[in-house]
Design a protein with these regions (language model features):
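Beta-sheet repeat architectures centered on beta-propellers
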Residues: 2-69, 353-357, 364-368, 375, ...
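Beta-propeller and closely related beta-pinwheel folds
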Residues: 51-58, 253-404, 433-434
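Extracellular/surface-exposed low-complexity repeats and stalk/linker segments enriched in Gly/Pro
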Residues: 85-93, 134-164, 185-194, 397-400
């Protein structure tokens, strides 16, 4: 007796050997993952766990992090350079740390320190107030006395050669000198204010505000022409001179600013809000090469700069890039084009800007600026911003900080539920990976390594592994629904994984069937000594229409390929 020959159900194999990172969108390609932890693109095209992190320092009250040939951080009210405490005393609270030449500048404290000479530090602002007699006299711009002169609306009757006369006939006083035949205007006439200690801490060229002078015309904003400890020279000519005992104050002030950046040997800043009872919506620049002076206006190309803006809303971030400076609001950017002649230009561009609270997310990666906006992460190369965060799905992030490292955009942010995420975007391949929920408040790149400072005070080497390296790394990768990519009925009969775990590293494979929440363990591998070829893990799920695969483990591991073998089912519903 003969039985009919049975025909095996046709099978189809799909193999993935290029893993596409995190993609939360429905119907994402096989090889991408709906969720993951502690993976990165360093092993692409394979799926690889991130390198172990090292804790290089522990802070008590972290407030800021930057690199100046070595890591620099703020802990409480102290500034540390490469672990050494400096003598600079700061206030409590978050800081903006901006580099300019050898100097590190700290906002909102308006303090500075020379990182090549840690004994040179202080305040960028300065103020003196007299306590004794103040003498006002006319002088040359260098401070040389002019001598005696007559004052009046008519010239002296019998002047001698070299006699001086202050002509007050036309309202504005003019000092003239008699050359033997006619009266000629004397140029370079200034006013000197002399009192003990009035000029201490100032330099020629400083833009200062003088207050309290009884002499008309001396109060106001001036650029100092010459300075000594006991006198200052300002470029005005007063009608009357003399002395007073009332206090005179001289102040070199810096405007309050929301964000500060350095570009072209200047500092640039912005401010939106109420200052001294007046609404302010302005962009500022320091004097060229001088971070202390923001009010030096002498008609030179090196002058300070200030400009009001018409766009509404608070400033949300700033970045120096593409040869200029960009100040962001949520719905626009103010692009500053610096000029060597001092004729700086600002253009308002209506486009997605930096989300409020995400000013620290603006970071350059290989010449492209990335930042977190209201609707995702954007890349700006000089034309218009483009959203690159579609694979992250509908999740919106806030309280974001970021840095660029090795062609990658590292982002630490918080979702609407308050959960923290460390996400890494490989800009060359367009791949996202999620690492963990470390509460990182600042990044910096130093010595080729990327550092992150957590709100708990841990200074982490995220890539180099220096310091106290963590013993093991727990990781996880979870696929979307497998088996929904074709309209006909198919059944996933076998999964095959080519993996290479390190010695004593563990990998487990679990599946969830038909959209369920229960996870069933199907296989496990533990790395062995001397294993170089890797392992092949065979998984045989029960018959189902669709399933999700979750890989999880401890220790470093690399997944080279994933194969899914499907068996064709009936054509019925």
């Amino acid at each position: 007796m003969f039985f009919p020959k049975l025909t095996a159900s046709p099978q189809q194999r799909r193999t993935v050997d290029r893993f596409l990172g995190l993609d939360r969108r429905a119907g994402s390609a096989m090889g991408s993952f709906q969720d993951m932890e502690n993976l990165w693109a360093g092993g692409y095209p394979a799926l690889e766990t991130r390198p172990p992190r090292g804790t290089t320092a522990v802070l008590k009250a972290p407030h800021g992090l930057v690199c100046r040939d070595a890591p620099v951080w703020v802990d409480g009210t102290a500034l540390y350079v490469n672990g050494d405490r400096t003598g600079l005393v700061l206030t409590e609270g978050g800081k903006q740390l901006v580099s300019m030449g050898a100097y590190l500048l700290i906002w909102p404290d308006k303090k500075y320190i020379n990182t090549q000479d840690l004994t040179e530090f202080g305040s960028m602002e300065h103020r003196t107030a007299t306590t004794g007699e103040v003498t006002i006299s006319l002088c040359r711009s260098g401070g040389e006395e002019l001598g005696s002169y007559s004052i009046g609306g008519e010239a002296p009757a019998a002047p001698g050669t070299g006699s001086l006369w202050m002509d007050t006939a036309d309202g504005e006083p003019v000092l003239k000198r008699y050359d033997g035949s006619s009266w000629l205007e004397v140029e370079d006439v200034c006013t000197k204010a002399a009192s003990a200690g009035i000029g201490q801490g100032f330099r020629a060229g400083d833009g200062v505000t003088v207050e309290g002078c009884e002499t008309e015309g001396l109060d106001g904003l001036h650029v100092l022409q010459a300075v000594d400890d006991d006198w200052i020279v300002v470029p005005v000519m007063c009608r009357t001179v003399g002395s007073q005992t009332a206090a005179v104050t001289v102040t070199r002030a810096i405007p309050d600013m929301d964000f500060v950046a350095e570009q072209g040997n200047r500092l640039w800043g912005c401010k939106y809000g109420i200052v001294n009872g007046e609404p302010v919506n302005e962009i500022y620049a320091s004097k060229l090469g001088d971070f202390r002076n923001w009010n030096s206006f002498a008609g030179l190309s090196t002058d300070s700069y200030a400009a009001s803006r018409g766009s509404d809303g608070v400033f949300t971030g700033a970045a120096a890039c593409l040869g200029g400076v960009i100040f962001f609001k949520e719905d626009c950017m103010e692009r500053v084009y610096p000029s060597a002649s001092g004729a700086h230009q600002i253009v308002t561009v209506r486009c997605p800007g930096v989300k409020k609270g995400c000013g620290g997310s603006a970071a350059l990666v290989d010449g492209t600026l990335f930042y977190v906006g209201a609707n995702g992460v954007y890349a700006f190369d000089g034309s218009m911003p483009v959203c690159v965060s579609q694979p992250l799905g509908s999740v919106r992030y806030e309280s974001a900080v970021a840095a660029g490292w090795n062609g990658q955009y590292w982002l630490a942010a918080q979702d609407a539920a308050g959960k923290r995420h460390v996400l890494v975007y490989d800009t060359a391949r367009g791949l996202w990976h999620r690492q963990d929920d470390a509460d990182i408040m600042a990044f910096t790149v130093c010595g080729g390594a990327l550092y992150g400072l957590t709100r708990g005070g841990a200074l982490l080497d995220l890539t180099g592994g220096s310091g106290e390296v963590e013993e093991t790394v727990r990781w996880m990768a979870e696929t979307g629904e497998l088996g929904l990519s074709a309209p006909e009925n198919k059944y996933l009969t076998r999964l095959e994984l080519r993996v290479q775990p390190e010695t004593r590293a563990r990998l487990e494979a679990l599946v969830s069937y038909d959209g369920g929440r229960r996870w069933e363990k199907l296989g496990e591998i533990i790395g062995g000594d001397g294993q170089t070829r890797g392992c092949l893990l065979h998984l045989r799920p029960r018959r189902c229409r669709q399933l999700r695969l979750r890989l999880k483990g401890t220790g470093r591991c690399r997944v080279y390929s994933l194969s899914a073998v499907y068996e064709k089912g009936s054509d019925g519903p």
